[in-house]
Swiss-Prot record, chain A:
Summary of the knockout phenotype: Sensitive to the mutagens MMS and MMC. Increased sensitivity to gamma radiation. Deficiency in homologous recombination in somatic cells but only after induction by genotoxic stress. Decreased pollen viability with morphologically aberrant (small and misshaped) grain. Moderate reduction in meiotic crossovers. The double mutant mus81 send1 exhibits severe developmental defects (e.g.
Domain of life: Eukaryota
Miscellaneous note of the record: Two distinct classes of crossovers have been demonstrated in Arabidopsis. Class I is MSH4 dependent and exhibits crossover interference. Class II is MUS81 dependent and exhibits no interference.
Record's protein name: Crossover junction endonuclease MUS81
Residues annotated as domain ERCC4: 404-503
EC number, UniProt record: 3.1.22.-
Organism: Arabidopsis thaliana (Mouse-ear cress)
Location of this chain's protein in the cell: Nucleus; Nucleus, Nucleolus
Function: Interacts with EME1 to form a DNA structure-specific endonuclease with substrate preference for branched DNA structures with a 5'-end at the branch nick. Typical substrates include 3'-flap structures, D-loops, replication forks, nicked Holliday junctions and also intact Holliday junctions with a reduced efficiency. May be required in mitosis for the processing of stalled or collapsed replication fork intermediates. Plays a role in DNA repair and in genotoxic stress-induced homologous recombination (HR) in somatic cells.
Swiss-Prot record, chain B:
Gene: EME1B
Biased composition (Polar residues): 37-51
Entry keywords, A to Z: Calcium, Cell cycle, Cell division, Coiled coil, DNA damage, DNA recombination, DNA repair, Endonuclease, Hydrolase, Magnesium, Meiosis, Metal-binding, Mitosis, Nuclease, Nucleus
Protein name per its UniProtKB record: Crossover junction endonuclease EME1B
Documented EC number(s): 3.1.22.-
Length: 659, 551
């Protein structure tokens, strides 16, 4: 009865097999296969085998003998499955397609909040940790910058708010409900925990592949390996495919478990320091055994300590012994700093790692240098010789220094413990840069070069001032705006950056803000950058930090340059210089007092100072002319040969010696 | 007597006017009057040749006879009459000077411009002749026959007759008044005869002198006009320079030179309409750098020395669409373009302006997301960061739509024009005119009105409320300086002069100004050396350089 025929058209073999499969399914049912039904299947099978032309669509199938409405409906699943498999070549798609009668799986739109949440969950839970908590997930998704709309239910300060709806309870986080409904994410309560399902992880991988996002090499390699056997076996007959799919399921789990042992961010943090992945994995396992489900930052510190202990107490070759000796004094310095209660404790720990492994980090930097040199354009139009920190003869910048981004501690987002602080940390990990928070005498953001062995710090030639639109408006009104620009100009930086955050068109002072931007750029020479919100500003800081490092790293100390070029000031001398700028002399105070008089311009004030450097000297001169008011009024004009106009001369007299 | 009768008969025939008959009735010596008016019939033809305005002058000729009568009466009068006649002569002169002016103006108005000057000269001559006539009666009183001969001699030339007629007519006018007053009847024959020969001599001299005067006056006028024109020109130039220095004409003189490729895109229409609204001049043509805009200033030659930097504005704008920009970045050619621009314009600020860059990238990423292809996001963020860090004076600006692009370019043009004339930030300009008063001050408005209060706030670490306390006690700087400059008080006493002043607290509790603030104010205001830091002065650094006994 079930004799297989020769299929005339090779392309129809799949369809013929499908018909046989359907017949088998019906035969296995409790009802059994009736005579009429069996006859119908046999007729259809023969027609498919005898067809000379390929059957690609349901229309083609309906025109063949033996395929009526019922049979066409039955065969519909094959064509839907075939379309999906041809497009995506993915067995889970086939399976899902069969179950859902050919519907596509849910994939969130690019740069939507669901998209960001899904990818964030995938990245953060690949390395062993199974779930994330709500606030943690929200902050991480915000920091990734994958979503164009804010994720959190509360609008943080400094974020550009895009209104979705006037209802207060609606926010980007509402997408999580959709993800849970679609079966991509599961949730448990008290407290709320969110975890990806297997389906969710596959969808996240799909999103990453489609958008071309960078991901860790291991994860990519795993993703690449999985589809290969599936793709190869897809053209085979269906029974074979289903068998292969079943076989693969047990293999996926062990790999996921093995790979999920280490969070990706910890790997990203320690790899640049020269630690091997095996070392990091081993240390993390030991630490995670000791502690329960804690925050990655805590585990991060523990892993750091464990790695250092392993290095110190394990047997070392001679070179390592020499490194150990050299790192001794730095340890003591670090301890002193810890005693002082430095706010940059975490980041100094990072630097400790780099300090302990100078050669290793140098080699890793060398690798980066090679790759970046290959990618570089080679068309740098630098017209000025940059100021460099001190370098040994023949030493390159990257061999000696790290570039660190310093944020002012008066910035609200930079304060420790704030919610937006997490954004800063995520930027730190994403861009692989170091960020510290200190009190800056001028500006909101500077970059320093810190020596890898000596721990000395030098201020590089870049400074940024950040202002959002509302700040800008009030600053223009009460004149802080001009005062701050003047202080930035006098601070000695060569590259002045002014970042305007937010859209000035929404402000009622839009014209004055735009004019101020033009004046700042054209007249004062600032580089004015526009961003939409705090997240974009911080990402801009990240890109600038990497670019500054690129700018300096291949600088070499030549005798000619060292003689001609000036050196970067140290951080302490920079702070002192800025404090000195705020100090005034007696003549400066007198000049400012003169500037308060109507009709007195800057030239007039300077002319008065040339003749009378102090207020006392001017008052004495007026007292000598007592009882002759007209002579007193004209005194400054006469003595300056009309450089000081009559009205200004009279007004100054009124201030100093008028009744 | 017979001759007189004959002459009178002739006049009756020629002058039928009724006015003559009336006058003959008034005066009994009608025969003498008629004989004196012999030249009258000759006058009429020249009058007719001139404009009709001379017709009203006919009554003046009748007055001529009256003049002669009055002169005769003077000659025969006694000493008293001589004195009176002298006074009257003075008054006559003044009257005569007044009377011809309206006539002159009338004649000048009617007569052609070319004829005005000779008329003016004639008037001058007549006035001088009249003055000499006043002196004649005293010297020549008995030469009756010579007067008659002179009269007959003058009647022959027409021009001379005209001159004489005009002179006599004016004399008649003044004499009428005298005649009415005196009412004395005497013969007047010898008087005009004496005056005539002297008039001839003086007229010739007067003519040449007057011509010289004319030339002098004309030269003076020309010189004055020239000097006035020069002064006006100077003032105009100075005003223009001031306008330029203030930058009022900047927007009118700036010219935007736009590359044709910029206008070919979707931005062109909006940009042109915006520029025309503002009235900014545009020059469209191929620029050395593609898709660029550069600006120049059209400056008049007079004002060019004020701008040593010349008409070029060191700013260049590159305008790109999103797709073109992404292609340049992906191919690695964008930085080459920037380098080429900097080679061509070494000292210029370069700004790269893109339109719809972010929305374009998002759109392409979404398309790539749905239907995977070969497109990859170019490293835009890295390249833009590199512009900021690796290059000097290279900026970037990203607009969301064409309207924002046009608005930015027009705003940039206006700012480039106005910033050429603005002063840069300096320490003094930042704190001018009360700018140093902080916004938190409750008495901000009060302080801004008083220069003395602002001067107090300018002292470092003196808060506005401290300044108010000092101001209430010493409302002017002089009142405080007088106390500080008083030699009878000790330095220590002056330093703590202000310590007990009441300062109004925020909540309401008063506190004292304090010793430190009082000392600070004294030492800053009374410092002799302007170069010391205020922090050092507050600690008493001035005492090391000066002897304590100076104050």
């Amino acid at each position: 009865m079930d004799d297989e025929r020769r299929v005339l058209c090779p392309e129809n073999r799949g369809l013929a097999a499908y018909v046989l499969q359907k017949k088998q399914e019906y035969a296995e049912k409790p009802k059994g296969l009736s005579e009429n039904l069996e006859r119908t299947f046999v007729k259809g099978y023969r027609s498919v085998c005898d067809a000379k032309d390929p059957i690609n669509t349901l229309k083609d199938l309906s025109q063949i003998k033996g395929f009526g409405k019922w049979m066409v409906k039955l065969m519909k699943g094959y064509f839907d499955t075939a379309v999906e498999s041809s497009e995506q070549e993915d067995l889970p798609d086939n399976r899902a397609g069969k179950k859902a009668n050919g519907k596509k799986r849910y994939i969130p739109q690019r740069n939507s909040v669901g998209y960001a949440l899904l990818i964030t969950l995938h990245r953060r839970t690949t390395n062993g940790k199974e779930f994330m908590r709500k606030q943690e997930l929200i902050d991480a998704a915000d920091a990734n910058g994958l979503s164009h709309a804010p994720v959190g239910p509360e609008k943080g300060k400094g974020k550009a708010g895009l209104g979705h709806s006037k209802r207060e309870w609606y926010s980007g986080w509402s997408c999580m409900t959709t993800l849970i409904q679609k079966g991509l994410v599961v949730k448990s309560s008290n407290p709320a925990k969110y975890m990806l399902t297997v389906e969710g992880r596959e969808v996240a991988n799909e999103c990453i592949l489609r958008s071309g996002l960078p991901d860790s090499v291991d994860i990519l390699s795993v993703d690449e390996m999985d589809p290969t056997p599936q793709a190869k076996k897809t053209p085979n007959q269906n029974p074979t495919c289903s068998f292969t799919m079943r076989e693969e399921l047990p293999y996926v789990d062990p790999r996921c478990r093995a790979q999920s042992a280490i969070p990706s961010d910890i790997l990203e943090k320690f790899t640049p320091f020269g630690y091997s992945k095996e070392q990091v994995v081993a240390a993390f396992r030991e630490v995670s055994d000791g502690s329960g489900d804690k925050d990655p930052s805590t585990l991060w510190l523990s892993v750091m300590c464990h790695l250092r202990q392993a290095e110190v107490y394990n047997s070392c070759p001679d070179s390592r012994n020499s490194k150990k000796d050299s790192s001794g004094p730095f340890k003591s310095q670090i301890r002193q700093v810890d005693l002082e209660g430095s706010r940059a404790k975490k980041f100094r720990s990072c630097n400790d790692g780099s300090t302990l492994n100078p050669c290793s980090s140098g080699s890793s930097h060398a690798v980066k240098a090679c790759s970046s040199s290959l990618a570089s354009d080679g068309t740098k139009g630098i017209t000025n010789i940059p100021r460099l920190p001190p370098l040994q003869f023949g030493e390159t910048f990257e061999e000696a220094y790290d570039v660190i981004l310093i944020l002012d501690d008066r910035e609200k987002f930079a304060t420790k413990g704030s919610r937006s602080r997490n954004i800063v940390e995520n930027i730190c990990s994403e861009f692989n840069i170091k960020i510290e928070v200190r009190r800056l005498p001028v500006g909101d953001c500077i970059w320093i070069a810190r020596h890898k062995y000596l721990e000395t710090e030098y201020v590089l030639d870049f400074i940024a001032e950040r202002k959002n639109v509302d700040d800008m408006r009030s600053s223009i009104r009460d004149n802080r705006y001009r005062d701050q620009k003047l202080r930035l100009q006098r601070s000695g930086f060569k590259k002045l950056i002014y970042i305007l955050e937010g859209d000035p068109n929404h402000s009622d002072a839009a014209e004055s803000i735009k004019t101020a931007c033009f004046t700042t750029e054209i007249l004062e020479g600032f580089d004015v950058l526009r961003t939409h919100g705090l997240g974009e500003t911080l990402r801009k800081y990240g890109y600038l930090t990497k670019s500054i490092y690129q700018y300096y790293k291949l600088r070499v100390n030549d005798n000619d340059q060292s003689k001609g070029a000036a050196s970067c000031p140290s951080f302490d001398s920079f702070v002192k210089r800025c404090q000195d700028l705020d100090k005034m002399t007696i003549s400066d105070v007198f000049a400012i007092q003169l500037m308060q008089v109507p009709q007195v311009t800057e030239e007039i004030a300077i002319a008065v100072l040339d003749m009378y450097p102090t207020l006392l000297s001017l008052a004495s001169a007026y007292s000598h002319l007592e009882a002759d008011v007209s002579a007193q009024e004209e005194m400054l004009r006469n003595r300056s040969n009309n450089v000081i106009c009559a009205s200004a001369s009279k007004n100054i007299f009124k201030l100093v010696w008028g009744e | 007597m017979n001759d007189h009768i004959l002459i009178s008969d002739g006049e009756d025939q020629t002058t039928p006017l009724p006015s003559l008959s009336k006058r003959a009735r008034k005066y009994p010596i009608s025969a003498i009057l008629i004989s004196d008016s012999d030249p009258t019939p000759q006058k009429q033809p020249p009058e007719s040749s001139f404009t009709p305005i001379f017709v009203p002058e006919t009554p003046l000729s009748d007055d001529f006879s009256v003049v002669k009568c009055s002169f005769g009466s003077r000659a025969l009068a006694s000493n008293r009459e001589d004195k009176f006649s002298g006074k009257r002569i003075i008054s006559l002169d003044s009257e005569f000077e007044d009377s011809p002016r309206p006539e002159t103006s009338k004649k000048n108005e009617s007569v052609l411009a070319g004829l005005r000057e000779p008329r003016f000269g004639l008037e001058a001559e007549t006035s001088e002749a009249y003055y000499k006539n006043t002196r004649i009666p005293e010297t020549n009183l008995d030469d009756d026959t010579s007067w008659m001969h002179e009269v007959s001699f003058r009647s022959s030339p027409t021009n001379d007759t005209i001159e004489v007629v005009s002179d006599q007519e004016k004399e008649d006018i003044s004499v009428e008044k005298i005649g009415r007053k005196k009412k004395i009847r005497t013969t007047t024959l010898p008087v005009p005869g004496e005056a005539l020969p002297k008039k001839r001599q003086s007229k010739e001299d007067k003519t040449s002198a007057m011509e010289e005067k004319k030339l002098r006056k004309e030269q003076e006028r020309l010189e004055k006009a020239a000097s006035k024109a020069e002064e006006a020109e100077r003032k105009r130039l100075e005003k223009e320079k001031k306008k330029w220095e203030k930058g009022k004409l900047a927007l009118k003189s700036i010219v935007a030179e736009i590359d044709t490729k910029v206008l070919e895109g979707s931005i062109g229409g909006l940009l042109l309409s915006r520029f025309s609204e503002k009235g900014i001049t545009i020059h469209v043509g191929p620029n050395p750098i593609e898709r660029s805009i550069v600006w120049t200033m059209t400056i008049p030659e007079d004002i060019a020395p004020l701008f040593p930097q010349g008409p070029k504005i060191p700013y260049l704008l590159l305008v790109y669409d999103a797709e073109e920009f992404c292609n340049l970045v992906a191919n690695g050619k964008f930085l080459e373009i920037i380098s080429r621009v900097q080679d061509r314009y070494p000292s210029y600020t370069v700004c790269c302006l893109t339109n719809k860059l972010m929305s374009y990238v998002k759109k392409r990423e979404k398309e790539e997301y749905k239907n995977p292809g070969n497109w990859r996001r170019p490293p835009i963020d890295e390249v833009l960061a590199k512009l900021t860090t690796h290059y000097v004076k290279v900026h970037s600006r990203h607009c969301v739509d064409e309207a924002e692009v046009a608005e930015h370019i027009v705003g940039l043009t206006s700012s480039l024009a106005s910033c050429q004339f603005r002063k840069k930030l300096t320490m003094l300009s930042v704190s001018a005119n009360g700018a140093l008063v902080s916004k938190d001050s409750v008495d901000k408005h009060l302080i801004k009105k008083s220069p003395w209060l602002k001067a107090l706030v300018a002292i470092p670490k003196v808060q506005p409320r401290y300044a108010l306390a000092v101001w209430k006690k010493y409302p002017s700087m002089k009142s405080l300086l007088k106390v500080y400059m008083d030699r009878n008080k000790s330095v220590h006493e002056k330093e703590f002069l202000l310590k007990d002043l009441k300062v109004e607290g925020l909540v309401g509790g008063d506190i004292r100004l304090g010793e430190i603030c009082s000392k600070r104010i004294y030492r800053v205001l009374m410092s002799h050396d302007g170069a010391i830091k205020t922090d050092d002065v507050e600690n008493g650094a001035a005492f090391f350089t000066d002897s304590p006994g100076v104050n």
